[in-house]
Amino acid sequence: MKISQLFIGLVACSAVFSHAAIEGASSNNANIKVGSAANASHPGGAAAVSVQAAGAPYNAFTGFSSLKGLAQAFAAQGTSNTNVTVGTKTFNISHIPVSAMPASHSALGNFNFGQVGSQEVYFGEWWKAGDTPASASHTVYYAGDNTNTTVPTSGTATYTVAGINGSATNLLSGNLTANFGAGTLQGSLTGTGTAVSSLTLNGVAFNPGTAQFAGAASANGTAGVNNSGVVQGHFFGANAAALAGIAQFNNAAYNTAFGGAKN
């Protein structure tokens, strides 16, 4: 089966929404939206993504689990799906370049996204065909199943975190520390080979009742230091077993998505 036929099938089947409690965000909803979808032909996941910039019929929600299957099936066309170890944690990283699509499907653009272990928690990036991750279309996003999520109200925990910025192979990595009593999240990620060489969370706070966090970020990279970053994200799972979020900058090349697992 051609990749175009498979992708159309996935999109068509994903039009029915699931009842899972999906939390997530995008740095540009005109390009990418996240949500929930039940895919009868390709079950196994609840979190989904929509390429809003593509228009109908390609802008229906498609489950990340289905996109993972596509990335696994078409390696000969340039896609990839790989398990990557960061510290002691495993992240599943998918790469679907527009070059793997026929010209008629170029509006679907380029995808890099990761999954935190086997949890229904995803984070990634997208940019238009003909653009690069340094272009204004560079959009980052995260989505996860919020069912049964609980957040402690005391104690601390560290998270091993992977970040995606312009590459599915050169990942950022680092540790974030949550102080559940104070409601703060802090730490940094570093890497090479992307626009961002370091990303630091500044003044990020959360409410255990909502499991959401927000604050500021600074980054250093190919365009120097950028202090304009805005961070948003969410804890997922029992006792905040995982997290995911995005850092958005006035220079879209610095936009970064990240996800992490509790140590």
Model feature map: region roles:
Residues 20-263:
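Mature soluble binding/inhibitory domains
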Residues 1-21:
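Gram-negative bacterial Sec-dependent N-terminal signal peptides
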